[in-house]
């Protein structure tokens, strides 16, 4: 496919397709071409694609003719603009309506318009029709804004990268077989729809996404459904090419999107039909099974460590076919209801053809699931609140009033005599609270400071309402006038409250909370309740007790949102026969935890549980107090309570009353109201840990008490008896996974399981929980999917073009978008797209975003990142310096380690290339021989790209002038807040004076609690919006770095480059080559597949693994545990006295005896490679997290040369830490080379081990001096 319009990109296309060398000149020429390309040019290039018939399908004409919006809205009794629900109670998303009648044309782009100002002004004056029109106009605009950048940029990058044709895979020694763009149905649809909408108009783009907002094409065929539809089509078009999705499946996905656009609301239709692909593929696979292999993992004891051992493979046979009940009827009904019967029957027909579990069958599931829409769903804040915060649970068996004692302040105690199942809830929380309060560390001033600091962040926390509630009792707060910080942060709030007594701040516990919104993919939008500082403060005992339960009493996994932070092997184990898994999720969990059942019991349990361990003590700045005790009938007594109990009293008052939610809907003028809700607040520090604790506790009660009492079926009884929450039920928040271990006879009978599940559902109804249970032969946990031990990445949940924009704040200025673009690339790596296609597309995309026009003084200039910046950020080169193409893997690390790795792989080639191209010199360097590398790297902009990549991509706001005394008053207030306990301050002071004696001068700027107030101050500054000057300053800095000429890389990288390796033979595979472990990572996707089988999959929780590599697991927010760790390791490495380590630990708040003991341990302990490498800031790259990098460090990297010892490679006895750095360097090279991970042997250290060690030690001493 040669396009006339794309000819200017030809050299770039050849360089990213591995035909010619990549060079910065070619890259920057292409970047210029990208920036000159107009939107209409993109559509002209699309016109040139000769689409084949199989890419076409009928587009329903109804997507262009939509009714006016006014019949979809009304004004309710409280004078709020509301959405009329036609399709069902949740039909409150953006309606698919015409929009042209609301627009006024743009002054220069006359074909485009935006919501007319006249309408907005009438809306401000309260005119009903105008308020309705404005609401529709704004929310439709918000739906159109949920993208990272204009769609045309993503499309152009696709046209450019795919113009290179098929790619030659040097590992498989053949060209890939992904059909070209002429078979890309979503792209054809994109073109046709845009053509039809623009009709005779000269402009082809249906809408413009600009920093000023969204401008709509003034066409009668334009509707609010077009932007989300186009966004989905572009996503699918890109995925079809870069993941090699099956075009016939993608076509079914396109049909659903077109149906959504033809319906009365795009987002609502998508939400109702999102289960179609998983339901008819993943959840109905293998009804007959004739073969294949699944992993045989053993879950090592204790299970809570989440370590697994690979025991080989297990062949699958007929007896492991899907035994769960069929979902055929349910699936067909859904298809009929939404006019998608043909899609459903086509999918089911295809699913039945897979009777063997292998690479092809799991790829089919992955491809199908990738076809679900990936837009961020949007609805107005008003509707979100009224949908989410009006549900109250139906509790079938409430706790009888007589089972409670009389009041003790705000709580009542549950009597032992109660027959309610609440007694088990009470017992668990009571025990956990008692043990938590009995732990000495709970009372340690540092621990309390960590708790008090964890919510002091640059995020908002309903500050306005907090201030109002305090003004109401005549407490005035310092306003820190003239301070250049963002006031709507909890940092600012903490400073304001730092010196107020609890008797004042406690008033704010009942203050309103403001409103936050999160838009999500394939889920309804959530409202977030940002709690204020006093509210978070009194939630601490609730959080701590829940943490105790989750740490000591159940199998909870904590995890972040990134795939790499979740426990992947758990899903592999749970879904591999003969094990079976049941996915249990609690519907509307926040709404189901209310005072009526849960919170009243939990508050009483904690209040009583902590009583004996906390007598008279204050906690986290909350003093002891006295309450009225009427628990014994007819007797009124005054009862002294501790600080912790005082917190529970205040928290109970809040939970009992409910939260008063202040909704100020920026999309609907005049929709300002306060809503009382009993729903548990999603912004509390307790939310997640609290739900987890209740989830496991209620399951334990079911397995041990309620279940056995409600059945006499011997099989079900035996099954329940064999399950425990310490071994078989993993949960996090409202998400649970029940794992039924296979027995010697094989799988547990599915009818027995069915009976138990029916009991669980019935059980939940007693206390208002609706358990959503899926038992279908697959495991789904924390949005990860597994079948027969193979992970199915859900590509649709990582939309390439989509971005959550929940509020109307402006887009972040360039170059911040580059972080998002690199984020897209790394998502694709974790999701196992086709490695070559993905690297090529990512190069095109990065190039398209690498250049920006800017004002430099009075003149227009251009800022341009060289291609090398992207390499530094982790994008692997394709072919460079005359190398073969595709020799660099996407597992190449970022930063200095990555630079070291790719340079080391082709170092002799680079020298040859430089000399051949006239960069020769008489001086010989240990790294590049007789090449004049300094001149070369400056001329090809390698040095400039390297240094530009390390500069901030957001404007720095901490340089703003502030009145000195106000600034000092502010940091002093933060210091008072943090050091609220004088004992803590004296520890730090003592540490400081010890440091002067034993540590000064060894390392600079050791981390200390005294740094935290200033760090918080900087954080509150950085949260503010950048000014023009700050943007210009950032641009200027980038410009200077680009113009500068350099003489070397960083000191570290220069030292690394002195180390040479010899790559040797491949190892035996770590896992069976027939075993699908991750859909899409298979022999058709050579490099990721060979890495997976040669390095092996990660078989333990990465989070637990890294937690073991830290001396201090937790610290105050504002200090970094890694920084503390590396300071301690540097001290040890530089031969500091143990007393210096003790001083360092005192400065971060440890008590002396603890600091002393830990320092002794650090001096003697054997430290792991991953931990030691921190001394030079080396860390395991994210892309390695799914692989067994630990055994790679241990077994693939050999520090003894292949042919025996050399003087140069010997490590001096006192420099054992060097080994860790060397292992990282060797592993970096192994992982950066494509193909099988080989064994690598140390060959030479230029100048010897001792000299290298000394270079690193010098660097450690100097590091931090500039900071």
UniProtKB/Swiss-Prot annotation:
One Pfam short name: RdRP_5
The name this protein goes by in its record:
RNA-directed RNA polymerase lambda-3
Subcellular localization: Virion
Which top EC class is given? transferase
What this chain does, per the record?
RNA-directed RNA polymerase that is involved in transcription and genome replication. Following infection, it catalyzes the synthesis of fully conservative plus strands. After core assembly, which consists in recruitment of one capped plus-strand for each genomic segments and polymerase complexes, the polymerase switches mode and catalyzes the synthesis of complementary minus-strands.
Q: Name one GO biological process term.
A: viral genome replication
Family, per entry: Belongs to the reoviridae RNA-directed RNA polymerase family.
Cross-referenced InterPro entries: DNA/RNA_pol_sf, RdRP_5, RNA-dir_pol_reovirus
- Molecular function GO terms recorded: nucleotide binding; RNA binding; RNA-directed RNA polymerase activity
Give the organism, scientific name: Reovirus type 1 (strain Lang) (T1L)
User: Where is the RdRp catalytic domain positioned along the sequence?
Assistant: 555-792
Reaction(s) this enzyme catalyzes, per UniProt: RNA(n) + a ribonucleoside 5'-triphosphate = RNA(n+1) + diphosphate
The yes or no answer to whether the keyword Transferase is present is yes
């Amino acid at each position: 496919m040669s396009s006339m319009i794309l000819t200017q990109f030809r050299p770039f296309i050849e360089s990213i397709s591995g035909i010619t060398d990549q060079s910065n000149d070619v890259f920057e020429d292409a970047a210029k071409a990208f920036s000159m390309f107009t939107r209409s040019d993109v559509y002209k290039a699309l016109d040139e694609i000769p689409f084949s018939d199989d890419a076409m399908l009928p587009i329903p004409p109804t997507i262009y003719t939509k009714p006016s919006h006014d019949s979809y809205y009304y004004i309710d009794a409280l004078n709020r603009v509301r959405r009329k629900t036609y399709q069902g109670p949740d039909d409150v998303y953006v309606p698919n309506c015409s929009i042209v009648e609301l627009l006024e044309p743009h002054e220069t782009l006359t074909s485009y318009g935006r919501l007319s100002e006249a309408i907005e002004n009438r809306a401000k004056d309260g005119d009903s029709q105008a308020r309705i029109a404005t609401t529709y106009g704004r929310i439709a605009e918000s739906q159109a804004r949920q993208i990272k950048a204009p769609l045309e940029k993503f499309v152009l990058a696709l046209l450019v990268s795919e113009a290179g044709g098929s790619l030659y895979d040097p590992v498989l020694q053949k060209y890939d077989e992904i059909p070209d763009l002429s078979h890309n149905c979503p792209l054809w649809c994109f073109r046709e729809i845009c053509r039809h909408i623009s009709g005779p108009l000269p402009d082809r783009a249906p809408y413009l996404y600009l920093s000023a907002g969204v401008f709509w094409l003034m066409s009668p065929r334009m509707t609010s459904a077009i932007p989300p539809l186009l966004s989905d089509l572009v996503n699918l078009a890109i995925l079809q090419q870069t993941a090699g999705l099956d075009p016939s499946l993608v076509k079914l996905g396109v049909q659903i999107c077109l149906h959504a656009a033809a319906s009365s609301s795009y987002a609502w239709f998508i939400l109702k039909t999102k289960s179609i692909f998983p339901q008819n593929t993943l959840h109905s696979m293998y009804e007959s099974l004739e073969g294949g292999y699944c992993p045989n993992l053993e879950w090592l004891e204790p299970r809570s460590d989440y370590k697994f051992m690979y025991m080989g493979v297990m062949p699958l046979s007929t007896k492991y076919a899907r035994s769960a009940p069929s979902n055929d009827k349910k699936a067909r009904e859904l298809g009929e209801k939404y006019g998608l019967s043909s899609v459903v029957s086509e999918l089911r027909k295809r699913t039945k053809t897979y009777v063997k579990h292998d690479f092809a069958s799991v790829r089919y599931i992955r491809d199908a699931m990738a076809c679900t829409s990936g837009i961020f769903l949007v609805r107005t804040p008003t509707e979100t609140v009224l949908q989410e915060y009006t549900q109250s649970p139906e509790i079938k068996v409430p706790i009888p009033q007589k089972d409670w004692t009389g009041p003790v302040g705000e709580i009542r105690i549950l009597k032992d005599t109660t027959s309610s199942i609440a007694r088990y809830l009470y017992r668990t929380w009571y025990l956990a609270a008692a043990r938590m309060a009995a732990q000495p560390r709970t009372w340690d001033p540092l621990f309390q400071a960590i708790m008090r600091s964890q919510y002091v962040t640059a995020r908002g926390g309903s500050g306005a309402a907090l201030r109002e509630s305090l003004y109401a009792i005549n407490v005035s707060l310092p306003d820190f006038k003239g301070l250049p910080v963002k006031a709507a942060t909890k940092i600012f709030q903490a400073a304001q409250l730092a010196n107020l007594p609890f008797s004042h701040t406690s008033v704010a516990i009942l203050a309103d909370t403001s409103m936050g919104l999160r838009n999500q993919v394939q889920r309804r939008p959530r409202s977030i309740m940002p709690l204020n500082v006093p509210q978070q403060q009194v939630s601490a005992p609730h959080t701590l007790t829940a943490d105790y339960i989750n740490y000591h009493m159940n199998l909870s996994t904590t995890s972040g949102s990134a795939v790499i932070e979740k426990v992947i092997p758990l899903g592999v184990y749970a879904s591999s026969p003969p094990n079976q898994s049941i996915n249990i999720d609690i519907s509307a969990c926040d709404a189901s935890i209310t005072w009526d059942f849960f919170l009243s019991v939990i508050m009483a349990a904690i209040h009583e549980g902590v009583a004996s361990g906390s007598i008279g003590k204050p906690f986290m700045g909350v003093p002891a107090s006295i309450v009225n005790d009427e628990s014994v009938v007819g007797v009124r007594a005054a009862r002294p309570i501790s600080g912790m109990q005082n917190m529970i009293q205040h928290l109970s008052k809040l939970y009992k009353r409910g939260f008063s939610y202040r909704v100020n809907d920026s999309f609907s003028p005049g929709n300002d109201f306060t809503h009382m809700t009993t729903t548990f607040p999603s912004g509390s520090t307790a939310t997640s840990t609290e739900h987890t604790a209740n989830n496991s506790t209620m399951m334990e009660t079911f397995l041990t008490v309620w279940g056995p009492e409600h059945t006499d079926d011997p099989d079900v009884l035996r099954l329940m008896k064999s399950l425990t929450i310490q071994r078989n039920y993993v949960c996090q928040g409202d998400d649970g996974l029940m794992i039924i271990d296979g027995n010697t006879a094989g799988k547990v009978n599915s009818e027995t399981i069915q009976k138990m599940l029916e009991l669980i559902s019935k059980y939940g109804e007693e206390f208002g929980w609706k358990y959503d249970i899926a038992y279908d032969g697959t495991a789904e946990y924390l949005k990860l999917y597994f079948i027969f031990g193979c992970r199915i990445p859900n590509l649709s949940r990582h939309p390439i073009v989509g971005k959550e924009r929940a509020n109307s704040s402006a887009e972040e200025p360039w170059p911040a978008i580059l972080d998002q673009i690199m984020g897209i690339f790394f998502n694709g790596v974790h999701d196992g797209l086709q490695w070559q296609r993905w690297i090529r597309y990512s190069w095109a995309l990065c190039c398209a975003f690498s250049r920006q026009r800017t004002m430099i003084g009075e003149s227009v200039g251009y800022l341009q990142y060289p291609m090398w910046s992207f390499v530094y950020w982790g994008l692997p080169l394709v072919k460079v310096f005359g190398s073969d193409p595709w020799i660099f893997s996407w597992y190449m690390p970022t930063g200095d380690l990555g630079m070291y790795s790719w340079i080391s792989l082709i170092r002799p080639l680079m020298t040859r290339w430089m000399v051949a191209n006239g960069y020769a010199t008489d001086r010989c360097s240990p790294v590049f021989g007789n090449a004049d590398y300094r001149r070369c790297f400056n001329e090809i902009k390698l040095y400039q790209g390297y240094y530009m990549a390390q500069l901030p991509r957001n404007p720095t706001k901490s340089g703003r002038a502030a009145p000195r005394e106000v600034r000092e008053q502010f940091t002093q207030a933060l210091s008072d807040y943090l050091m609220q306990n004088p004992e803590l301050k004296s520890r730090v002071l003592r540490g400081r004076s010890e440091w002067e004696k034993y540590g000064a001068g060894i390392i600079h700027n050791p981390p200390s609690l005294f740094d935290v107030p200033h760090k918080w101050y900087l954080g509150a500054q950085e949260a503010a919006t950048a000014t023009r000057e700050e943007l210009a300053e950032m641009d200027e800095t980038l410009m200077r770095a680009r113009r500068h000429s350099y003489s070397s890389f960083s000191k570290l990288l220069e030292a690394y480059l002195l180390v040479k390796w010899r790559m040797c033979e491949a190892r035996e595979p770590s896992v069976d080559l027939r075993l699908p472990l991750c859909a899409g990572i298979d022999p058709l996707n050579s490099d990721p597949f060979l890495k997976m089988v040669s390095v092996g999959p990660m078989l333990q929780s990465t989070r637990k693994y890294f937690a073991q590599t830290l001396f201090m697991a937790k610290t105050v927010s504002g200090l970094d545990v890694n920084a503390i760790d590396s300071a301690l390791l540097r001290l040890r490495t530089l031969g500091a006295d143990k007393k210096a380590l003790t001083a360092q630990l005192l400065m971060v708040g440890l008590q002396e005896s603890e600091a002393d003991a830990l320092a002794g341990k650090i001096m003697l302990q054997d430290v792991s490679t991953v931990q030691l490498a921190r001394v030079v800031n080396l860390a395991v790259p994210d892309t390695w997290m799914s692989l067994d990098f630990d055994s790679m460090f241990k077994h693939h990297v050999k520090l003894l040369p292949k042919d025996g010892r050399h003087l140069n490679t010997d490590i001096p006895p006192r420099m054992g830490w060097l080994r860790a750095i060397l292992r990282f360097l060797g592993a970096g090279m192994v992982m950066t080379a494509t193909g099988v991970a080989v064994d690598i042997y140390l060959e030479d250290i230029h100048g010897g081990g001792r000299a290298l060690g000394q270079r690193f030690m010098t660097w450690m001493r100097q590091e931090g001096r500039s900071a």
